[in-house]
């Protein structure tokens, strides 16, 4: 049996709460094993510290997160926080109108798991990691991963920072910036030997840069078929930058 959860705003609690689609109010204590165990509460800017939402074994959990805060992130792990959203059987949809759909900062660890993952950030970045943040989207079991945004689809900056995007079919699109961007020693990996099709589109599809005093950054992409689309010229990734873009084919 599938379970579907959605996020609503609770005026009484002044926070966004996860509720079962079959109920009209916030889940009560003990009403759902998964919510009770996960203790999931969302604020208008990010999931609370230590949040973990996983599926009961053998069941699917559909998670829809809508974050209207224009100054915040859809889901964030910061200052050493470790967060996992979903399971390999989940259907994940995250829509954030703020700065970033999902973010990991200052050695925060954020993992988004799902059979299918859709992340939309029409006003900002789809994903962002910085200052040692570790961000993982999808797993080897993920069928399709879609990242759609106005700014960078994948953004990583500073040493010891990494972003990994997995899925058998991956589509990353930025309407106004780089599809994938790495700088100042950060590392990005998109796809794996299990990825069939990878599409990246943006002002520059892929940009990895090194400024004068920084270590080199890298972007590694791997798939059976790779499609890169450059929407228009981006001066940030023209001659003068030290770029390190690595392509792999299974």
Question: Where are the predicted features?
Answer:
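Right-handed parallel beta-helix/beta-solenoid
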Residues: 76-82, 103-111, 128-136, 155-163, ...
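C-terminal trimerization/auto-chaperone modules of long, extracellular attachment fibers and adhesins
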Residues: 53-55
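N-terminal Sec-pathway signal sequences of secreted and cell-surface proteins across taxa
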Residues: 38-43
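Bacterial Sec-dependent N-terminal signal peptides
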Residues: 1-37
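Beta-strand-rich solenoid/repeat architectures in extracellular/passenger domains
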Residues: 59-72, 82-100, 114-124, 138-151, ...
């Amino acid at each position: 049996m599938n379970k579907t959860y959605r996020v609503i705003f609770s005026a009484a609690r002044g926070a966004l709460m996860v509720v079962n689609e079959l109920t009209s109010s916030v889940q009560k204590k003990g009403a759902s094993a998964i919510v009770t165990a996960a203790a999931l509460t969302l604020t208008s800017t990010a999931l609370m510290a230590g949040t973990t939402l996983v599926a009961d074994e053998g069941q699917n959990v559909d998670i829809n997160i809508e974050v209207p805060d224009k100054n915040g992130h859809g889901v964030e792990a910061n200052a050493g926080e470790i967060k996992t959203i979903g399971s390999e059987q989940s259907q994940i949809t995250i829509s954030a109108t703020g700065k970033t759909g999902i973010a990991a900062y200052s050695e925060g660890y954020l993992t988004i798991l799902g059979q299918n993952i859709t992340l939309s950030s029409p006003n900002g970045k789809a994903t962002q990691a910085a200052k040692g943040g570790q961000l993982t989207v999808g797993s080897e079991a993920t069928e399709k991963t879609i990242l759609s945004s106005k700014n960078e689809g994948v953004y990583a900056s500073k040493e010891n920072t990494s972003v990994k995007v997995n899925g058998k079919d991956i589509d990353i699109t930025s309407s106004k910036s780089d599809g994938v961007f790495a700088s100042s020693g950060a590392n990005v990996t998109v796809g794996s030997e299990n990825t069939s099709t990878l599409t990246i589109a943006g002002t520059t599809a892929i940009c990895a840069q090194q400024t004068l005093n920084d270590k080199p950054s890298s972007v590694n992409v791997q798939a059976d078929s790779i499609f890169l689309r450059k929407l228009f010229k981006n001066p940030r990734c023209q001659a003068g930058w030290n770029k390190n873009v690595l392509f792999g084919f299974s």
